[in-house]
Amino acid sequence: MESDRHLWQLEPWMPGVADFRQSPSEVRLSAIMRLLARVHRVASRYEATAVGREWFRTDRSQSSPALGERITMIDQWTQQRIDHAVTAIQRDCSQPMRDTALEMLGWYRQSHGRVRAELAGLTQQLVPIHPCMRDVWHDHVLFTGDDVTGLIDPAATRTDTVATDLSRLLGSLIGDVFDPRWVHALDVYNQTRPLSISEHQLIRVLHLSGVLLSGMTWIERRLRGSLTDEMLPRVLDRLQGICECWRSCQQV
């Protein structure tokens, strides 16, 4: 709605708690995968208005927009910019943050070229695209007992492949791609909304690039000064989790 020359997005207050990590179970994981598959099936039938087609179109055979976007994000981290980040982190950050950020920057130096090549190698893969949440992760999935009672914050929703949602969600719920729960989760999803070989490939590379770039995003926010001292402990936890997830990705 529009009020006082501002646009407001209004959403109902959903019951439940984002507590999967505190109480993980196969039943809960299956519940969110079945729900997400149903959401995607409905979204695939969405018919956008002429005005909304830029953001919310559907297409049965198209390249994932996320691939080009992530290639651009990688290209923006030039060697000079990485060197500047290393110098700034060494100078300005306390030890726990400094050590974790420098580890992430080291991973980035070693791996960004390979990740970029994998993204580029899939740009010719054509898959169905339709509105996807694109930022569906642990804290946006609310549980009441074993039931999913809220899937919140659709602000990032835009047309893309279902692999954007699946890689983001499973990366945040499970992390390690070698955890058997990844296979179980995708099997459950596949029962409601079958995945193609191309979509499976996209899930993997979007997870890989998402982990790498999310670490750089937090580092950039720290360098810009947009993180308050009160936020730093939680940001450090996020960065350490990203580094742990990235270590598991090296086995892929």
Please state what every model-predicted region is.
Residues 1-56, 60:
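ATP-binding pocket architecture of kinase catalytic cores
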Residues 35-38, 42, 73, 77-80, ...:
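Alpha-helical scaffold segments in carbohydrate-active enzymes
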Residues 48-49, 80-133:
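An alpha-helical support segment within catalytic cores of ATP-dependent transferases
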Residues 72, 76-80, 84, 88-92, ...:
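ATP/Mg2+ or Mg2+-diphosphate-binding catalytic cores
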Residues 197-207:
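All-alpha amphipathic helical-bundle segments outside canonical DNA-binding/catalytic cores
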Residues 162-194, 209-226:
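Active-site activation/catalytic loop segments of kinase-like enzymes and analogous catalytic loops
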Residues 113-164:
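Active-site acidic catalytic loop and adjacent metal/ATP-binding pocket
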